[in-house]
Amino acid sequence: FLRGTPILVQLMLTYYGIPLVLRGLNQEYGLDWNINAIPAAVFAITAFAFNEAAYMSESIRAAIQAVSPGEIEAARSLGMTSGQVYRRIIIPNAAVIATPSLINTLIGLTKGTSLAFSAGIVEVYAQAQIQGGADYRYFERYISVSLVYWALSVLIESFGRFLENKMAIQAPESVDISGVGGDR
């Protein structure tokens, strides 16, 4: 469901749906939760968290499945337990594989937060609209917003490259692989 529906729809379902559920719980169990005291940001964070969890879990699942079965078999033949295989082989290799995808998802999340305005949250985009309405200089405001999002994306991407370089496994230079795969 989460990967098949737009984040804007999920934001609206969360923003309007959670208070309905809480109101029902209040009536059913005699609770005294003040629904109006919950900030709109809580609903937006909930929607973004569930949405991103759906995409990130798929990236992590694919990365785990991409770990070479030969490496896992070799670890087991050395007598490693399942826990040791996960800690020493699967998780480190899956982390290397999943990092670029997870960083890309984080960049998408950062840009997607501009949709939180539709749930009544005044974030960067909303602030630009408010200020643009005051002085009718929308274009300059939107250029500023785009530069902020671009700078955040560059920072996240740089952090991702740093992580990738830290986790990179260097192939030994002395290994000759020219004959691998046979002659054709």
Name each model feature, range by range.
Residues F1-R184:
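Transmembrane alpha-helices and adjacent helix-loop boundaries
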